[in-house]
Amino acid sequence: MTLAEFCEKIALPDQVVERVLSVPAVPEELLVQLRTPELWPLGRAAVKAYLKPDADGFGELAAQLQCALKTRETYRFSEEIFIETMKCFTRFVVEHLESYGRYGFDRGFWTVRQLSGVLFRIGELEYETRENAIHLHIPSDAVLEPERLRRSWEAARALLGAGEMVCHSWLLSPDLPGLLEETSRILAFQRNFHIFDPEPEDSVRQWVFKNPNLSDEALPEDTSLQRRLKAFLLAGNTFRAARGRLREEPFQ
């Protein structure tokens, strides 16, 4: 598969593809560091140094997409899971557009997990394999319907085997029940976890308001959650994320 074909498979926007294909090939001795967990910081720094200047992160994006093709050569799951997993790149450049009004890539610190074959998109959810547990992540485009979540969980169990599943997310916040209707899908999602260790969390600004740099007063009010969370913050409250252990038979 060529890089252009790969970009088409993951539905990367044409404007981004043009920028990606203009970046020269990055040496394999640098790319291999991006898919080696203990070398992630070193690899990212080396790639950035090799590609300077790198306006809006397109150089790093191109390098990571080149690396993804190397990952594909030894990928342990199906082509479908590989492509769905790597669509994270498309999701992130579109989120950059939503946040800042232009395409860009600023999630290279995260996508090395996908490149290293330790984080997979299986249906609606992502699963990251670590030594002591399987860490569950919720992509921004996940549909939190019980049937879809159950299918994702069952498929993940079949592929990844037994092991405790845990999650750390703003979606598990103990503050959300006071901000959402009882029928909310987010609250239904929460009920599948034993929730513990709430702590202050700023990432909610990115996920709910699409821009982490806005002041409380400037936060948008386009959705009911945005309006309620903005009022919560303006009242001087601190929003918390939390950790959770997935129940044995979730998403019923």
List the model feature ranges, each with a label.
Residues 170-173:
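An acidic- and aromatic-residue-enriched active-site/binding cleft used to recognize and process polar
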Residues 1-144, 161-164, 175-252:
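Non-catalytic substrate-recognition and accessory regions of acyl/acetyltransferase enzymes
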Residues 145-159:
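Well-ordered, non-membrane alpha-helical segments in soluble/globular domains
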